[in-house]
Structures are given as C-alpha cells and as structure tokens.
Amino acid sequence: MREREYATFLFAIYSGYAFKMTQLTVARQVMAHRGRRLEYFTIVWNGLEGLIAVAAGIVAGSISLVGFGMDSFIEVTSGATLLWRMSVDADVESRERNEKLSLKIVGACFVALAVYIAYESVSDLIRKRSPEHSIPGIVLACVSLIVMPILSRAKKKVGNALGSAAMKADARQTDFCVYLSTILLAGLLLKAVLGWWWADPIAALIMVPIIAKEGIDGIKTRTCC
C-alpha cells in the first residue's frame, strides 16, 4: 500500500513538473512568434521609411535625410537577422549558434552606422552643408518618433522574456533610430526657422561614440541566452 502511495506521489510530482515545463515551452513559443512578427514589421516599416527618406533627401538635396534613410536600411538588415534567429528558437543548439552570430551582425550594423554618421557629419561641417527644407522629411521624422518608441518597448519585452541578448541589442538599435529621428527633425526645423546649418552635424557627432560602443560590445559579446 505504501509503495502504491509513493508511486502515486511521484507520478503527481512528475506530472506537475511536466505540465509546468509544457506551459513554459508554450509561453516561450508564443513570445518567439511575437518576436518574429515584430521583426517582420521592422523590415517592412524601415524598408518603406528608407525609400521615402532617400527619395526625399535626393529631391531636397539633404544629406541628413539620405543618411536617415541609410540608417533605416541598416535596421532592415538587423530585423532580418533577428527574424532568422527567431525562426530557430525551439532548437537550443541552433538558437545558441544563431544568437552569437546575430549579436555580431547587429554589432557590425552599429559600427557601420557610426562610421557613416561620422563621415557625413564631418563632411557637412567642412563643406558647411545643411539640410534643405523638406516637408516630407519633417512628416517622416514625426511619424518615426511615434512608431519607433512603441516598437522598441515591444522588442525589449520579448527580449527579456526569451533571454535574447540579440533581441535586446536590436531594441537598442531601434532606440537609436528614435534619436536619429529627433536629430533629423531638429536639424530640419532649426535650419528652416533659425538658419543654424551646423545644428544637425554637431548633434549627430555626439551620438557617434555611443553607437560605436554598442556595436563593439555586440561584436565582442560571447554569452547568450
């Protein structure tokens, strides 16, 4: 009788543990699916944003708008990388391998972005170039300031739930898109209202070391999940 009770007790414990593990697995799959949807949205949004910004920049002769568009294309690369990572979340070994590679790719995107912004900012200062008046550029920057913070918070939530350093790094990159949108908007408005041609390149240069540090940290990171 005691053996039967003991066996029943062990079975109950095992069943409860198995049920709990199943719940955790299902919850993780749900968050991974949410992460994939966020990355799909990131790719589509930034692709359109990049095309509009580059087109508006060429029409207005604005280097800042063109640079902003290039940043959006880098965000597309980051989003595609994280989408790849999310697609193998159920496979532990593949997840770990892709996590490391994702961190390095996202880090490389940060570094590339920092180099590009530094180059364009210095060029603007030397040549005394400034953003031209662009209504599409101002509208685009305003919309980006609404969408990007919401997207960043959603990515951070998924990154924390999955323990994904790559997703958190991508969320930080989305934050930088918010900063760049602010800089773009401020540059366009200050030039249009006050004629301060140097405001945009100086503000962009302030961001360069921060972006570069994030990129280097991402490339050097060894731990994941």
Question: Which residues are covered by each model-predicted region?
Answer:
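N-terminal amphipathic/basic-hydrophobic helices that include classical n-h-c signal peptides
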Residues: 1-20
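Alpha-helical transmembrane cores and adjacent cytosolic helix/loop segments
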Residues: 14-225
